C-alpha cells in the first residue's frame, strides 16, 4: 500500500539501471519538495528533462560520460501548454523492419521523434548496412523531430552490437532480432538483461520466435547470438501463445509472417491496444499496396 504525502522530502538517488521511468518519477517528486533533489542517473531517455527545460522549470543537468547528474528544485506553478506528441520510433520500427526485410523497398515515415536517446535502432541498422536518413529536421518543444527515409539493402550485414546502443533501442530489439535473422553471418547482442523485465521475458521470447522460424539462436541470461540466413523462407505452421499478452511479440510476429511466409496463428491481438491499436489497419494498407 502506498499512501501519498503533502510533505515530500528532497533526496539524493543513484539510478543505475538506465530506467527513464524511475528517473522521471523522482524528478516529478522533486518538484513538490522544499529542497533540492539530486539524481545520479545512468544514461537513459531524457524526454522529461527536455520538457522541463522547455517550460523553464528549475532543473539543472550535468552530462558526464556514463551518467547524468540532475538537480530539481521546488516548482510552485506550471504554465499550461498545448503539446502535439510526435510519432514514436518504437511504433515506426515495425514498418522500418518490414521495409528492410522486403528487399528493394523504400519508406518515408513522417514526424518521428529522433531524440538521440531514442534512436538506438537507427544506429544499429546503419551498422547492418541499412540506408537511413533524416529529412525536414526541426526542434519542437525541445525535441528533435524529422521524417525518416529508409531503403532496404541488398545484403543485411551481421554485427557484434555495441552495448551502448541498448538503452536507446530497448523496445525495438525484437524487430532487430528479426532483421538479424536475415543477415549474412552471426550477430551478437549483449547486456540485455533488461529485456526480460518487460511485459514478457522478451530476450527468451525473441530466441523462441527465431527458433520457431528455423533460425539458430543461442541465448544466455543477458545475451543472444543469431545465426542469420539470407535465404530464409518459412513453409510450416507457427503458433504464438494466446497467454503471452505482449503487444511487441504479437506485432513482431506479424512482421515475420509478412516477411518470411509460413502459416502463422497469432492469438491475443487485443494486446496491441497497449501501444498501437491501429497497427493491423495500417499493415493492411501495406498488403494492399503490395497487391497493386
Predicted regions and their residues:
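Structural preference for solvent-exposed beta-strand-turn elements
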Residues: 1-292
Amino acid at each position: 500500500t502506498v499512501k501519498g504525502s503533502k510533505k515530500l522530502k528532497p533526496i539524493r538517488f543513484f539510478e543505475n539501471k538506465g530506467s527513464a521511468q524511475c528517473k522521471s518519477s523522482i524528478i516529478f517528486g522533486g518538484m513538490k519538495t522544499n529542497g533540492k533533489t539530486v539524481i545520479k542517473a545512468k544514461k537513459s531517455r531524457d524526454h522529461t528533462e527536455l520538457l522541463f527545460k522547455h517550460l523553464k522549470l528549475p532543473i539543472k543537468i550535468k552530462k558526464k560520460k556514463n551518467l547524468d547528474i540532475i538537480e530539481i528544485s521546488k516548482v510552485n506553478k506550471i504554465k499550461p501548454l498545448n503539446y502535439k506528441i510526435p510519432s514514436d520510433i518504437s511504433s515506426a520500427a515495425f514498418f522500418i523492419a518490414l521495409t528492410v526485410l522486403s528487399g528493394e523497398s523504400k519508406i518515408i515515415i513522417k514526424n518521428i521523434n529522433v531524440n538521440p536517446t531514442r534512436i538506438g535502432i537507427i544506429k544499429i541498422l546503419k551498422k547492418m548496412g541499412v540506408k537511413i536518413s533524416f529529412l525536414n529536421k526541426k526542434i519542437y518543444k525541445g525535441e528533435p523531430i524529422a521524417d525518416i527515409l529508409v531503403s532496404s539493402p541488398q545484403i543485411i550485414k551481421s554485427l557484434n552490437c555495441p552495448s551502448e546502443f541498448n538503452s536507446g533501442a530497448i523496445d525495438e530489439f525484437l524487430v532487430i532480432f528479426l532483421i538479424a535473422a536475415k543477415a549474412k553471418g552471426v550477430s551478437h547482442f549483449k547486456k540485455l538483461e533488461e529485456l526480460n523485465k518487460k511485459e514478457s521475458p522478451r530476450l527468451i521470447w525473441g530466441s523462441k520466435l527465431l527458433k520457431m522460424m528455423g533460425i539458430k539462436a543461442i541465448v544466455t541470461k543477458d545475451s543472444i547470438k543469431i545465426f542469420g540466413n539470407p535465404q530464409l523462407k518459412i513453409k510450416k505452421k507457427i503458433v504464438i501463445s494466446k497467454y503471452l499478452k505482449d503487444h511487441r511479440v504479437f506485432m513482431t510476429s506479424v512482421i515475420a509472417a509478412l516477411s518470411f511466409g509460413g502459416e502463422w496463428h497469432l492469438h491475443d491481438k487485443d494486446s496491441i491496444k497497449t501501444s498501437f491499436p491501429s497497427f493491423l489497419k495500417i499493415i493492411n494498407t501495406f498488403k494492399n499496396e503490395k497487391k497493386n
